[in-house]
Structure formats: C-alpha cells, structure tokens
C-alpha cells in the first residue's frame, strides 16, 4: 500500500512538472511593426497611396501559355489499375490541358475577376494587392469591416464566390460586411520580398497595417490555411484590433494541445471529443499526413529548386497545383482519375493556376513554408504558446487537412464562442461550399457581437479550463457521469 501511494505521488509530481513545461506561456516578443521588406533600405518618404488596379490576361501571355502547353513533351501514363494514388493522373491531366488551351475563356474569366474593385498599396515596402468591396446597405444595417486571408496556392480569387454573399444584406441580420480580401505577399498580384524572414507573424503585422491604412482600427477576420496562421498571430499580437476571428482551419499549436492528442489516444474514455472518429486512431491521421505532405517537405527545405521546373512549365505547374487542390477537397477519391478535383469548378481551379503562372509567383509563394520551419525565428514559435482572448468561431469541414476538437482549440482560443462541423466540404471552403461558409460567417459575427455586448456572456474557457489537463479529464468524467444518470 505504501509503495502504491509513493508511486501515485511520484506520478502526480511528474504530471505536474510536465504540465508546467508543456503549458508554459511565453511573453509577447518585441517586434518592429514597420520592418522594411522592400528592396534596399527604408526611404525617408514612403508612398502610402492607394491605386486602383485591373487584372489583365494579355494576348502575349495567353499566346505564350498556349504554345508552351501544346509543345509539352509526352506525359507518362499511369500504371495499370492506378488512378490518382501516385499523384496527378496524366490521362485526366491531358484533358484539362486541352480544355485550358481550347475552351477556357481567358477574356471572360478576367472580366469575372474584375467585377470587384481591385487596389494596390505599398505596405512596408511591398506592393500589396487586395479586393475591396463596400456594400450598399439600407438604413438600419450596420457595415462591419471583414479582412479575408487565403492560403497556398491561392490568392484573393478564392473568395470571389463568397464576397457577394457577404456584402449583401441577409435576412435576420442587422449588419453586412465591407470585405477586404488581400493577396498575401508573394501570392497572386502581391509583390514578394527579396529579404529572408517574412513569415506568418510578419505577414500578420502587414495585414494589420493594411487595415489601419484603410481606416479600420477594429475589424473582423475570416481565414484558412496560411491565412489562418497569419490571423492567429494577429489575434495574439493585436487583440485590441480584432473584434472576432472566423477560422475554417482551426488549429491550436500549443504543446499542451499536442500532448492532449496523445493522451486521448491512450485514454480515450477521458476525452470529451465532439467527433472522435476524425481524430482517432492517430495512426490513421499520421498515415494520411505522411502520404500527402511530400510537397510540404520540398517547399519547406528547397522551394527554389522545384520552383525552376514549375516556373518554366505550365503543364507541370497545373499538375502540381491541381493535385493538391484535389486531395484537399476529398481525400477519399484517390481511386478516381480526378482524385477529388471534380468537387471544384475547373474554371476556378484554372483561374488559380493562370494567376500563379502569369505572375511567376510559385517560388515566392512556396518560400513561406521555408520561413515557417526556420526555427531561428524564435518569436514565431513562442507565439504559438500564447493564448488569445479574441473571440473565435471554428467551422470544420469533413475533408479539412486536420481536425481538432473544441476542448483542444480552447488551449489557444480561450473564447471559442461558436463551433460547427459538417460532414461535407474540404480545405477550399470559399470555392467548394461558399453558401455554407457565408452563412457561418454571419452567424459567427452575431455571436461575436453578443460576446462584446453583454457581461453575462462568460468565456467558455473560464467555465471549462481545458488548458489544465487534469481539469480537462475531470470535466469529461463529470460530463459522462451526468449523461449516465440522466
């Protein structure tokens, strides 16, 4: 008995000590909020003008693109009985390349892209491109600023289906959105930097500076993929500016969160997970990540090398981009020629490829992966450990790259005021399920407003302190006990 008590005390001591390490919260780093990312050194006088911009698919670009596709070398056919398991099915790719040359209407597509007002302005030395749509609101309808941030390999084009839904008054809501959809630096029509170190933290600073230039000291954010990384850092660094954060790729990267995932796999009965089948067994998730993360490792280590091939060949660029857009739209369709790409409108997909091709920005977009992995940027890593009190809403689509239950998300986002899960949809929510995304943004912002307007709306983090592992397990056990006795 004495040995048992001693062992229990020792184990408890280990857990307490381990918790103090993995649950450590670092101090906010000191950052230069006007760091110069343009060529050379910062000039004494800076251009802060806002310039109208038009997208142009010019004849020279179109002619060169088509000629390169027509002159491509013979593509290697898939193995017998293989569809998309080895990557892009080249028989299916041939059909898309033919469509791109013969049927993709470049002029019609550019007119569609230009239906929104486009602008450029220099932020910290880089020419940033953004879409800015102001709604025509009726009396009594409040206009709320919303910053939208995309990821790889996209641009602000990703939001062209959802923008009209967000800028149109919606029945049951007394507000509508003024949308600012920005291209991340080095993506789309935004200039890339020639200086190392421009990571998601620094991009978050730039996006805040963009909104301040547009006159918005307080605003909401909607983001996914890399955009969600940038936005998460914004909520950590600038909570006074962010009224609410809608995230369609919600992740807590705190060490305590990763520890909980492991504990949950060992003791699943202790874990209060809303959809455990999306998390466990962990080996299935790791198997998926191992299978599909080859591009991540390439872009995180030697982006410039693979960039040579992708910059020189539109056929190669199309295959590279479309294969990832396919798998992120439905990972269960590898046994089909399209591999999941059929879930997206092919014109939307080719818009993304064409924009990347014409701007020669595949290398500058991929370099963001290298900067993410560079551990020398210690403040970037430390930022993950700092919780934020900015209210956050999570929307989780079935085929998102990763999934975390709410009790883990609260480690980072202490005021998780809304969470919805869907048994459909994927990573490119604004293209794949724009109506659902727009509806969720409206509903979430309504919760954000409620959060700010009433003192009775307490933080779920305070009611369920899941950052404490022991409390997490106790809460789950008490919850299950209530269910058992009801």
Region spans (language model):
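Terminal signal-anchor or tail-anchor transmembrane helices
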Residues: 1-30
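C-terminal subdomain of alpha/beta-hydrolase-fold enzymes, centered on the catalytic histidine
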Residues: 13-15, 299-466, 473
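Non-catalytic accessory segments flanking enzyme active sites
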Residues: 61-134, 360, 364-378
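Glycine-rich "HGGG/HGxG" loop immediately N-terminal to the catalytic nucleophile
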Residues: 106-108, 157, 184-198, 232
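Short beta-strand element of the alpha/beta-hydrolase
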Residues: 142-151
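Conserved alpha/beta-hydrolase
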Residues: 166-189
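Conserved hydrolase catalytic core segment
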Residues: 169-174, 217-259
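Conserved acidic catalytic loop of the alpha/beta-hydrolase fold
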Residues: 201-219
């Amino acid at each position: 008995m004495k040995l048992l008590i001693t062992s229990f005390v020792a184990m408890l001591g280990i857990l307490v000590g381990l918790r103090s390490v993995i649950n450590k919260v670092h101090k906010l780093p000191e950052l230069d909020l006007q760091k110069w990312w343009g060529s050379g050194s910062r000039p004494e006088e800076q251009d802060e003008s806002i310039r109208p911009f038009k997208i142009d698919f010019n004849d020279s670009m179109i002619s060169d693109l088509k000629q390169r596709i027509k002159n491509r070398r013979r593509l290697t056919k898939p193995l017998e009985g293989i569809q998309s398991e080895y990557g892009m099915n080249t028989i299916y790719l041939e059909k898309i390349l033919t469509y791109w040359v013969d049927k993709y209407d470049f002029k019609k597509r550019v007119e569609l892209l230009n239906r929104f007002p486009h602008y450029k302005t220099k932020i910290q030395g880089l020419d940033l491109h953004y879409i800015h749509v102001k709604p025509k609101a009726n009396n009594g309808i409040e206009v709320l600023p919303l910053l939208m941030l995309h990821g790889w390999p996209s641009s602000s084009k990703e939001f062209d289906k959802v923008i009209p839904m967000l800028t149109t008054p919606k029945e049951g809501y007394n507000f509508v959105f003024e949308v600012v959809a920005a291209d991340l630096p080095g993506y789309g029509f935004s200039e890339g930097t020639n200086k190392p170190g421009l990571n998601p933290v620094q991009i978050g600073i730039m996006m805040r500076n963009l909104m301040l230039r547009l006159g918005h000291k307080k605003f909401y954010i909607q983001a996914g993929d890399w955009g969600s990384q940038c936005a998460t850092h914004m909520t950590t660094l600038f909570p006074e500016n962010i009224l609410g954060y809608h995230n369609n790729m919600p992740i807590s990267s705190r060490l305590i969160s990763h520890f909980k995932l492991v504990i949950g796999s060992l003791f699943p009965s202790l874990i209060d997970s809303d959809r455990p089948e999306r998390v466990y067994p962990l080996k299935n998730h790791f198997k998926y990540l191992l299978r599909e993360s080859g591009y991540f490792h390439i872009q995180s280590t030697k982006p410039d090398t693979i960039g040579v091939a992708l910059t020189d060949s539109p056929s190669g660029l199309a295959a590279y981009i479309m294969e990832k857009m396919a798998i992120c739209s439905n990972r269960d369709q590898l046994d089909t020629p399209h591999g999941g790409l059929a879930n997206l409108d092919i014109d939307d997909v080719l818009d993304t490829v064409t924009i990347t091709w014409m701007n020669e920005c595949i290398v500058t977009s991929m370099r963001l992966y290298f900067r993410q992995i560079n551990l020398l940027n210690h403040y970037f890593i430390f930022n993950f450990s700092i919780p934020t009190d900015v209210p956050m809403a999570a929307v989780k689509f079935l085929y998102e790259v990763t999934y975390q239950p709410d009790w883990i998300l609260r480690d980072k986002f202490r005021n998780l005021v809304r969470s919805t899960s869907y048994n459909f949809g994927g990573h490119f929510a604004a293209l794949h399920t724009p109506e659902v995304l727009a509806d969720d943004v409206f509903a979430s912002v309504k919760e954000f407003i409620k959060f700010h307007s009433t003192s009775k709306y307490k933080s779920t983090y305070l009611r369920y302190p899941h950052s404490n592992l022991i409390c997490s397990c106790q809460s789950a056990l008490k919850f299950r006990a209530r269910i058992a006795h009801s």
